Amino acid sequence: MSHNRAKMHFLSKIILKLLKKSSLKKLSSSPNSAIGGSIKIGDFCNFSFYPNAKKISIGSGFSIRNYCNILVSNNAELHIGNNVFMNNYCSINCLEKIEIGENTLFGEGVKLYDHNHQYSASPDFKVEHQKFNSAPIKIGKNCWLGSNVIVLKGVTIGDNVIIGAGCVIHKDIPSNSMIINKQEHIVKNL
């Protein structure tokens, strides 16, 4: 039984290597892309670059851990600076433009959305599945976004910003700031 287990372990390592090579090929084969050196890609990452993406640039020293997703739609731009680190389960969803400054760190589960679904309230409430409103996201350099931070469309985050875990960012944040999510509010005493 241990021989079979060793074979399976060996095969799974080969499959993971092939998946990583495929991910790197996707990154570098996009016609409007510029990719720096020393890029590290974790396991089970997904890159969806539409054929008519306007521009994709990823700086040197980019490191992305496991189970991350990056989507860049047609006519969209993604710019990632040098030495950016994304931890496990991060997601970038770019329909217009997202910029991430150099030396920025993402904790686990960080999500960036430069768009939201269009909807109408009358005569009947309806959310559109394939129609979106979008606005660029810009994250400065030397930032740290804690675990499970969500950044919504139209936000600019300055340089040297720390955002605590679990924050939903829907407004601009000036440089040299720290944002925390206060959750000490007691709803009911038992």
Locations of regions flagged by a protein language model:
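Domain-scale signature associated with acetyltransferase and cell-envelope carbohydrate enzymes
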Residues: M1-Y113, S134-L145, V149, D159, ...
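Conserved coupling/switch loop of ABC ATPases
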Residues: E96, K153, K171
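Short beta-to-alpha loop/turn elements within the nucleotide-binding domains of ABC transporters
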Residues: V155, C167, I173
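Binuclear metal-ion centers of metallo-dependent hydrolases, dominated by the metallo-beta-lactamase
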Residues: I163
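Proline-centered turn/helix-capping motifs that create local helix->coil transitions or kinks
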Residues: L112-A121
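Glycine-rich, flexible loop/turn motifs
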Residues: E128, N133, I169, S175
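Short glycine/proline- and charge-enriched loop/turn segments
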Residues: S120-Q130
